[in-house]
UniProtKB/Swiss-Prot annotation:
Compartments where located: Cytoplasm
The name this protein goes by in its record: Phosphate-specific transport system accessory protein PhoU homolog 2
Source organism of the structure: Methanothermobacter thermautotrophicus (strain ATCC 29096 / DSM 1053 / JCM 10044 / NBRC 100330 / Delta H)
UniProt keyword terms in alphabetical order: Cytoplasm, Phosphate transport, Transport
InterPro entries per UniProt: P_transport_PhoU, PhoU-like_sf, PhoU_dom
Major location category of this protein: cytoplasm
Coiled-coil annotated spans: none
Upper taxonomic lineage: Archaea, Methanobacteriati, Methanobacteriota, Methanomada group, Methanobacteria
CC terms in the record's Gene Ontology section: cytoplasm
Subunit-level organization: Homodimer.
GO MF, one annotated term: protein homodimerization activity
Taxonomy, superkingdom: Archaea
Amino acid sequence: MWKLIGALLESRLSNVLDETVRYGNETSERVGRTVSSYIKGDEETARELIETTAAVNEKSYRIEDECLKILGLHQPVAKDLRLASSIMRSAIELERINILLAYIARYAIDGRDRTPPHIEFMSQTVQDMINDALGALMNRDIQLLKRSTRNYIQLQDLYNQLQESNRDFSESGNLMLVARNLLSMGHHVMGMDDRIAYLIVGKRVIHHKVFYSVLMK
């Protein structure tokens, strides 16, 4: 009886984990498409991305609902509890990233600005952070998690460089707003990393000194 219940819990967790990874991969791909639409002034793609945001984020609600059912029905403990918590937090952060992407797509429609290479680099860094976080979640891989968190420093550096060269916000148009949204996406990936670190090492580390000694080296 208990083995059957345990197998059912494992199956449900595995399925919702797979769905979260697919959702994350789709979000990562949308980061690239959205920033590309902004750089190229591609209004058609930008509109398509905005119009599909709600449908894409339905996945977040399904994942969260399934995790709540798992927590309520199975009352998992230890690693299973941490996994369900990590999956739910990841889905929430991915939803927020997709909302930020819709704002960037809106800027693509409003008008094209001079776009320095920093924006493309920031976009790729966010995608790398998401992909590494998903790999860490899927495989309990601390090295991928370290790489994801370290990339946040690169993201901040790129933002700071851009801010330094665009001090006059009145002349930078939507450029700094796009950069801020990309930096905020990095914040949300760090939120994922926080919970995934808890899954792997059994400690909340992002806002703790352990974070700097374990993940940022």
